């Protein structure tokens, strides 16, 4: 594959993932994926995000007969007490999610997959996050902003949700939805040049 390739397909509509790719100088074309994101019975959070990231990438590949550029896909989930927290379906559910993490550590798992003519590579980023102790009023005020509605775990660390986080151990960009270290590594493996970096 041509080492001078600088464009990829991004299998995501996430503005946060787009922002992070712009940050590292990778141009992309969005081709949204459409797969079933249901959790399997007794499926671990790590296995869940790896399966979805791989499935999203391969689903997009199937719609690209030429596959002239690599496809990057990702999936993020939050896990507390072994329970997977996806995107809240209502403000009530968002409040419950935030209450379950209040004053406690939880994990954010983000898997990425890069598919090319040579196959599909995957990587996993896991970050521990400590949320501050939150009162009902603080939770209600945050949820009323609307920010939690499209976020796994009902918060966005890059926005107002960042004021609720005391500490993280791991990848900040991974919590945002695209771990840049792992992403750059897999893209370089596919011949995508990342400005200012090398193997």
Curated annotation (Swiss-Prot):
- Give residue numbers for the site Important for substrate specificity: 16, 76, 158
Q: Give any GO molecular function from the UniProt entry.
A: dTTP diphosphatase activity
**Name of the protein:** dTTP/UTP pyrophosphatase
Record-listed E.C. numbers:
3.6.1.9
Q: Which transformation does this protein catalyse, written as a reaction? A: dTTP + H2O = dTMP + diphosphate + H(+); UTP + H2O = UMP + diphosphate + H(+)
A Gene Ontology term for the protein's cellular component? cytoplasm
Which catalytic residues are annotated? Answer: 75
What this protein is reported to do is described as: Nucleoside triphosphate pyrophosphatase that hydrolyzes dTTP and UTP. May have a dual role in cell division arrest and in preventing the incorporation of modified nucleotides into cellular nucleic acids.
Tell me its cofactors.
a divalent metal cation
Q: Where in the cell is the protein located?
A: Cytoplasm
Q: Which NCBIfam families match?
A: maf (TIGR00172)
The record's Gene Ontology biological-process terms are: nucleotide metabolic process
Q: Which residues cross the membrane?
A: none
Organism field:
Methylobacillus flagellatus (strain ATCC 51484 / DSM 6875 / VKM B-1610 / KT)
- Going by the record, the broad EC class of this enzyme is hydrolase
Q: Does the keyword Iron-sulfur apply?
A: no
Family under the similarity heading: Belongs to the Maf family. YhdE subfamily.
Keywords, A to Z? Cytoplasm, Hydrolase, Nucleotide metabolism
């Amino acid at each position: 594959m041509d080492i001078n390739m600088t464009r990829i397909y991004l299998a995501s509509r996430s503005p946060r993932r787009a922002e992070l790719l712009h940050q590292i100088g990778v141009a992309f074309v969005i081709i949204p994926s459409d797969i079933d994101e249901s959790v399997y019975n007794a499926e671990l959070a790590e296995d869940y995000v790896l399966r979805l990231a791989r499935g999203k990438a391969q689903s997009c590949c199937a719609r690209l007969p030429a596959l002239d550029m690599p496809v990057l896909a990702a999936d993020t989930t939050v896990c507390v007490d072994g329970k997977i927290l996806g995107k809240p379906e209502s403000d009530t559910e968002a409040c419950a999610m935030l209450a379950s993490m209040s004053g406690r550590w939880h994990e954010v798992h983000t898997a990425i997959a890069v598919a090319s003519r040579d196959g599909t590579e995957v990587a996993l980023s896991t970050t521990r996050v400590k949320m501050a102790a939150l009162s009902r009023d603080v939770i209600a005020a945050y949820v009323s902003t609307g920010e939690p509605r499209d976020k796994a775990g009902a918060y966005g660390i890059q926005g107002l949700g960042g004021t609720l986080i005391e500490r993280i151990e791991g990848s900040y960009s991974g919590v945002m939805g695209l771990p840049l270290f792992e992403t750059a590594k897999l893209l370089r493996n596919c011949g995508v040049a990342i400005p200012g970096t090398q193997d």
